[in-house]
Amino acid sequence: MALKRIHKELNDLARDPPAQCSAGPVGDDMFHWQATIMGPNDSPYQGGVFFLTIHFPTDYPFKPPKVAFTTRIYHPNINSNGSICLDILRSQWSPALTISKVLLSICSLLCDPNPDDPLVPEIARIYKTDREKYNRIAREWTQKYAM
C-alpha cells in the first residue's frame, strides 16, 4: 500500500512539480527521499537552496512522513537538528495530504513563521520584537549555509 502510494506521488511530482520545490528517492530506496526548496523571493531566505530529507513510514499515508532540513536555517519553527514544527507533520496529518502539499506548506512557513508555536523560542522572540534583526540574521545564515 505505502509503496504504491509513494510511486503515485513521485509520478505526480514529475508531472506537476510544486513551485520552488523538488523531491525524489535517494538511490533505490523509495522510502527515503531528498527534497529541495528554493528560498521564497519574499523572504530573507531568497536565493538559498535548502535540502531536506523525507522518510516515509511503512504505514504511509496513514502516518505522516518524517521531514527534516539538512541545510541549516535560521527560523523559529526549525531547530538546529532540522526538525520542523508544522501541525500537518504531527497532529493535523491526513492521508489526503501529499509530499507536494507538505513541501508547499514548508515554503509558506518560510514566508510566514509561526512565532506562537516555536521550536526555537529565542528566534521567535527576536522575530516578534526586532523583525529587522531577524531578517538580517536569516539572510546571513542563508548566504552562509544555503548558497
From Swiss-Prot:
- What family is it from? Belongs to the ubiquitin-conjugating enzyme family.
PANTHER family, alphabetized:
UBIQUITIN-CONJUGATING ENZYME E2
Q: Which Gene3D superfamilies match?
A: Ubiquitin Conjugating Enzyme
Catalytic activity annotated for this protein? S-ubiquitinyl-[E1 ubiquitin-activating enzyme]-L-cysteine + [E2 ubiquitin-conjugating enzyme]-L-cysteine = [E1 ubiquitin-activating enzyme]-L-cysteine + S-ubiquitinyl-[E2 ubiquitin-conjugating enzyme]-L-cysteine; S-ubiquitinyl-[E1 ubiquitin-activating enzyme]-L-cysteine + [acceptor protein]-L-lysine = [E1 ubiquitin-activating enzyme]-L-cysteine + N(6)-monoubiquitinyl-[acceptor protein]-L-lysine
UniProt domain UBC core: residue ranges: 1-147
Q: What class of enzyme is it?
A: transferase
The protein's assembly and partners: Interacts with SCF (SKP1-CUL1-F-box protein) E3 ubiquitin ligase complex. Interacts with CNOT4 (via RING domain). Interacts with E3 ubiquitin-protein ligases CBLC, PJA1 and PJA2. Interacts with PDZRN3. Interacts with PPP1R11. Interacts with E3 ubiquitin-protein ligase PHF7; the interaction inhibits cleavage of PHF7 and promotes association of the complex with the nucleosome core particle.
Enzyme Commission number(s): 2.3.2.23, 2.3.2.24
SMART domains reported in the protein's UniProt record: UBCc
Reported function: Accepts ubiquitin from the E1 complex and catalyzes its covalent attachment to other proteins. Catalyzes 'Lys-48'-linked polyubiquitination. Mediates the selective degradation of short-lived and abnormal proteins. Functions in the E6/E6-AP-induced ubiquitination of p53/TP53. Mediates ubiquitination of PEX5 and SQSTM1 and autoubiquitination of STUB1 and TRAF6.
| Biochemical pathway | Protein modification; protein ubiquitination
Q: Which gene encodes it?
A: UBE2D2
GO BP annotations of the record are:
protein autoubiquitination; protein K48-linked ubiquitination; protein modification process; protein polyubiquitination; protein ubiquitination; ubiquitin-dependent protein catabolic process
InterPro entries (UniProt xref): UBQ-conjugat_E2_core (IPR000608), UBQ-conjugating_AS (IPR023313), UBQ-conjugating_enzyme/RWD (IPR016135)
What positions constitute the catalytic site?
A: C85 (glycyl thioester intermediate)
- GO cellular component terms, A-Z: cytosol; extracellular exosome; nucleoplasm; nucleus; protein-containing complex
* Descriptive protein name: Ubiquitin-conjugating enzyme E2 D2
- The UniProt transmembrane annotation reads none
Care to name a GO molecular-function term for this sequence? ubiquitin-protein transferase activity
UniProt keyword annotations, A-Z = ATP-binding, Nucleotide-binding, Transferase, Ubl conjugation pathway
State the CDD domains in the record. Answer: UBCc_UBE2D
